[in-house]
Each structure stands twice: as structure tokens, then as C-alpha cells.
A protein has these predicted regions:
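C-terminal helical/coil "lid" or tail adjacent to the Rossmann-like core of SAM-dependent
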Residues: 8, 181-240
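A short, conserved alpha-helix within the catalytic core of class I
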Residues: 107-116
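A conserved beta-strand element that flanks and buttresses the S-adenosyl-L-methionine
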Residues: 99
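Conserved class I S-adenosyl-L-methionine
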Residues: 1-34, 48-52, 71, 208
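Conserved catalytic/acceptor-binding region of the Class I
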Residues: 111, 126-194
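Class I SAM-dependent methyltransferase SAM/SAH-binding core
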Residues: 38-91, 112
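Helix-to-beta-strand junctions that scaffold the AdoMet/dcAdoMet cofactor pocket
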Residues: 107-108, 121-123
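Short catalytic micro-motifs in class I SAM-dependent methyltransferases
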Residues: 102-103
């Protein structure tokens, strides 16, 4: 998780633990045999993936790294936990696996970040990364449009570019470093009815909405949230029971460096 001005809310984030965990398990299933070394959960958040990593790598030291003190306080299942800016983090020893689930999308300059992380690995080690690539979807484009329209003094997206690149753009970054596997998946998420909120807003409010809400006063945030709820009613119509279906695209990469 990124460490922004306002810390993360572990309780709000955990509401959709199952939906957020499935992509991590899909990524972990593609991790090959590993050399000797630690396993690092980079951007570990509340520790949702710790148990799965422990089962997969039972004989290794498991380290959780995150920039959020609140998330680290509730994260369990690690042999060690480190509070650190994941963009500048340095391991104590070269790890066998750096596993990063839904964290690196908060950082830019992936053409430099990913080679740096790969360079920290033990020979034959693996970098496994999953990131949302949802920026063009209505759930995210509506946030930008509403923020720029309602608060132009604070939000300007005229030169904005998403941090996560198209999948093919990662190939020339990663291929010189070792064996690469790249793929995308779209998950059709069923979001249960939410009292007083559109289900998609309830899903995004602890993640994609945070950078916007952090810059707003309480009355502004209330108005922004109401406008966002209204926009979502048109793009993600509710089912008869009040639930909503939300397609969600995610990008996966597994790099095993040459030994």
C-alpha cells in the first residue's frame, strides 16, 4: 500500500477481502520453483496473502513490507514486518521471491522500478506482480471527470497518464532480465447490495477514491461521493436485489531472473 497523507483504513479495505485475494492466488499459482532465500510480500497491506504465501513457501522466512502503519499493525502471519516506502525499499539479503499484489500501481516509473526490484533478487529468483488496470473503466474515469469538473482548482488531468502501462509495454522492460510471463484477466465481480451507497462506490472508496477524498473537505467529499454514486447508477445498473456486477481488469507479470 502507498503511504499517503491519510493512512489506509484496514476495516474498509477488508470488506472485499475475497475479491482482492483471488487475483493474488492466481498470480501465486504461476510462481515457479524458487532458489534459496526469503519471500517478500511487497506492499503486504493487511496481510491477506500471508497464509497463501506461507503454504506455498513453508520452509522460508516470510517478510511483509508496507508503507502504511495501520495496515502493518493488523497484518499477521509474517516472520518480520517492515515499514518502508516500497519504491526505495532494500532487502537485508537477496530474496528468492518478491511478491507484489495490487501495490505497484500506486507508483510510477515502472520502466525503472521493475528492473530495480529484479536486481534485488537472488540468482534465479522471481518477481511476481499483479496490478489493477482499470483506469479506462467507468468506475475510475468517472472519478477523474467529476473531480476535474467539481474541483478544477485541485484536479487537472489534461496531462495525466496512468501508472500501469498496457501489457505489451512491459515486455521490453522485463524480457532482457530473464524469463517473462505476462497476461491480463478480467474478473466479473458480483458486489452485494450496500446500504446508502452504490456497490461499486463501496468497493472503490477504500482504494481508487482515496487520492480524491484526501484532498477534499468533509462537505466537499460528501458532494463528490453523491455525484459519484449517481454516475455509477448509469454505468453499473443494479440487479433486482440491489447488487451490481463490476468487470475488473488486472495485469499479471512473472519474471524469473537469469541465475
Amino acid at each position: 500500500m502507498s503511504g499517503n497523507a491519510q493512512d489506509w483504513n484496514p476495516g474498509a479495505y477488508a470488506r472485499f477481502r475475497g475479491l482482492r485475494l483471488r487475483p493474488a492466488l492466481d498470480l501465486l499459482a504461476q510462481v515457479p520453483e524458487l532458489p534459496i532465500g526469503d519471500v517478500v510480500d511487497l506492499g503486504c497491506g493487511d496481510g491477506a496473502v500471508a497464509e497463501a504465501l506461507r503454504l506455498r513457501c513453508a520452509d522460508r522466512r516470510l517478510i511483509g513490507v508496507d508503507a502504511s502503519p495501520a495496515m502493518l499493525r493488523v497484518a499477521a502471519g509474517y516472520d518480520a514486518k517492515h515499514l518502508a516506502d516500497i519504491a526505495a525499499w532494500q532487502p537485508e539479503a537477496p530474496p528468492a521471491l518478491i511478491f507484489s499484489n495490487a501495490a505497484l500501481q500506486w507508483l510510477g516509473d515502472h520502466d525503472r522500478l521493475l528492473p530495480r526490484l529484479a536486481g534485488l533478487l537472488a540468482p534465479g529468483g522471481t518477481l511476481a506482480v499483479q496490478m489493477p488496470r482499470q483506469y479506462a473503466a467507468p468506475s475510475h474515469s468517472a472519478l477523474r471527470a467529476l473531480a476535474a469538473g467539481m474541483f478544477p482548482d485541485r484536479f487537472d488531468f489534461t496531462e495525466w497518464k496512468p501508472a500501469v502501462l498496457p501489457a505489451a509495454d512491459y515486455w521490453p522492460i522485463l524480457a532482457p532480465l530473464g524469463q517473462v510471463s505476462l497476461w491480463e484477466s478480467e474478473y466479473l465481480q458480483w458486489l452485494e447490495p450496500a446500504e446508502g451507497a452504490h456497490p461499486v462506490r463501496r468497493f472503490t472508496e477504500s482504494t481508487a477514491m482515496r487520492p480524491y477524498l484526501d484532498k477534499l473537505t468533509a462537505p466537499e467529499a460528501e458532494a463528490f461521493t453523491a455525484a459519484y454514486d449517481a454516475a455509477l447508477e448509469a454505468t453499473y445498473p443494479r440487479q433486482a436485489d440491489g447488487a451490481a456486477l463490476m468487470p475488473f481488469r488486472r495485469l499479471f507479470m512473472v519474471l524469473t531472473v537469469t541465475g
